[in-house]
Structures are given as structure tokens and as C-alpha cells.
Amino acid sequence: MVFRIASSPYTHNQRQTSRIMLLVLIAALPGIAAQTWFFGWGTLFQIVLAAITALVAEAIVLRLRKQSVASHLQDYSALLTGLLLAVSIPPLAPWWIVVLGTGFAIIIAKQLYGGLGQNPFNPAMIGYVVLLISFPVQMTSWLPPYEIAATTPDILDTLRMIFSGHTASGGDMTLLRTGIDGISQATPLDTFKTSLRAGHSVEQIMQYPIYSGALAGVGWQWVNLAWLVGGVFLLWQKAIRWHIPVSFLLTLALCAALGWLFSPATLASPQLHLLSGATMLGAFFILTDPVTASTTNRGRLIFGALAGVLVWLIRSFGGYPDGVAFAVLLANITVPLIDYYTRPRVYGHRKG
């Protein structure tokens, strides 16, 4: 009998990088479907543009670095980076916005550090923050959900808006952002913060069409619940661990509840924080990035809690309506320190 001698490892599992990334892409389908339903075809077009840009940028850099292009592209990490950025920007943002942001995320935030596994910051969030700071108007021009929109563009008009900035009838972003009440709409978090600064009371703000009959804004609560469904799928498949999303959501809810309890006239309610903006997307798809998050169980709990506090602080007192991207990057900075102080004790070690 002939025995084949193989090198280690002698045990194998299915947790390959490509499989985990593919599971995350599959888990994103409910969120993508919900955003497309409420905000139109632009979400899908932005994803296509981001995916093409991510693959091309990754291939170019890999070729320049004389590395295998095919093997690296097959891990789906570039596709996931493009997807996360695409669903974070307004559906009708100009085409160059997503191309520029995705290119920056892949080339600068990922490959410049050495590629997958070497980057200290989440590439998609780096790209998003660069776009938000550089092009605030384009990055905050969200359409109202179709239920309260005065005008809803079809597929062709969506393409025209992305590539030319106008519909076939000459309509522009200002017209499309107008709600059924004739007022230009924004996201629930943006509307809440802007209206408070304008001197409106919370009771008045909650009467706006974007909040009518909804816990956290028309359409947005369902989008967040869809991302939550995808997150539960990832937990079920053991593609992510529970520590980060649970600690993040509990901390955000606790901070929001305490703030709302002591200052209900100036701070948003817990349900608005939990079911609006990028809360569930951040909790299950962004913060859980295995490269840039903490690697110990205690560290993951601290990392998630820190991000939750930062999101609440930025939303409540900062200059931006949604602080998920900034919170993720600030939490990424602390990961080496968190991991250092939460390292498990070496087996057999006894404290002196």
C-alpha cells in the first residue's frame, strides 16, 4: 500500500476567505433589495459601477505589484468593498462619485498597505469619508422614499441622472428630492438634526411626511430590518461572531435611551437611532470586518461598544447626521491597543 505524504495543515475547514466574502455578498441581498424598492434603480447601477471599478483598480495594482491577478480577484474582497461603498451613497449620485470613492478605497486604503489582511482601516469607509468631506452636496442628496416622493424616475431617467444630471424632461436633483409636501427631503437623521437647528420642536419634526406612520422614517426602518435579516444569516452561517454587533447595538440603544430620557426635546429617540441611517449595515457588515476589527472576544465587545458610543455622540452633537463611517474608522485606530490589553493568558501561565 502506498501512502501519500502531505505537508501541514492536516485538518481543514471551509472558512476560506472567498467563502466568507461570498456569504457576506449573499447576506447583503435583502438590504440591496430593500434599498432598490424604496429608493429606485440607482442603487443597482451604483453597485455595478462600484464592482467594475473595484475589480479594475485591484487588477491594475496587482499587475503593478507583479502578483497573481486571478487568484486575488477570486477572494471577492474587492467586490465586497465596492458593494459596501455603493449602498452607502445616494442612489442618484453622479457616476464619478462612486468611481472615485471605490478607486480610492481599493488603491489607497487597501493595496497601499499591502492588500487584504494588511489594511488597518476599513477601505469602504475610508472611501466614503473621503467622498463625504470632499463632495458633501452630492453625498447628502438622498431621494425621498417612493411613498412620499413627488416624482419617481424610471430606469432610463435614473441612468440619465447618474451620467448627465438631468432626466429626459429636464428634471434635476432638486426636483426629484421634493416630497409630496413640496419640501426638499433628506434622510430621517438629517431631517431631525437640521430641523432642530432651525428651531423646530421634536413634536413638529415628527409630523413631517418622512416620519408619518413609521418608527424611524418611511422606508428607512424596512431597509435597516432587511440588513438585520442579512446579519442574522451571517450569524447563522458563523461567518461573523455575535460580540461586535450585539455590543454595538446595545450600547447605541443605551446611550440613545439615556439621552432621550434626560433631553427628549433635543435628542433623537432610540428607535430612530436603531432603525435609521446605516445602523444595521454598520453593525453586521462593516464593523465585523475581520481585518480591521478586534481579534479577541473581550476586545470585540469593547470595540463594538466604543463604536456605539461614537455613533451616538456624532449623531447627537457632531456636524454629520450619520456617524457610522467616522465611528468605524475611529474605532479601527484603537484596535491594536484593545487587542494588546485583551490578549488571552498563555496556557500554563500563572500570575506571580
Swiss-Prot record:
Locations listed in the record: Cell inner membrane
Keyword check for Secreted: no
Record field: transmembrane: 20-40, 42-62, 69-91, 123-143, 215-235, 242-262, 267-287, 301-321, 322-342
Keywords assigned: Cell inner membrane, Cell membrane, Electron transport, Flavoprotein, FMN, Membrane, Phosphoprotein, Translocase, Transmembrane, Transmembrane helix, Transport
One cellular-component annotation, GO: plasma membrane
InterPro entries listed in its UniProt record: NqrB/RnfD (IPR004338), RnfD_bac (IPR011303)
Topology of this chain in the membrane: Multi-pass membrane protein
Function: Part of a membrane-bound complex that couples electron transfer with translocation of ions across the membrane. Required to maintain the reduced state of SoxR.
Assembly, per entry: The complex is composed of six subunits: RsxA, RsxB, RsxC, RsxD, RsxE and RsxG.
HAMAP family per the UniProt record, alphabetical: RsxD_RnfD
Family of the protein in this entry: Belongs to the NqrB/RnfD family.
Protein name from the UniProt record: Ion-translocating oxidoreductase complex subunit D
Originating species: Salmonella paratyphi A (strain AKU_12601)
Lineage: Bacteria, Pseudomonadati, Pseudomonadota, Gammaproteobacteria, Enterobacterales
Name of the encoding gene: rsxD
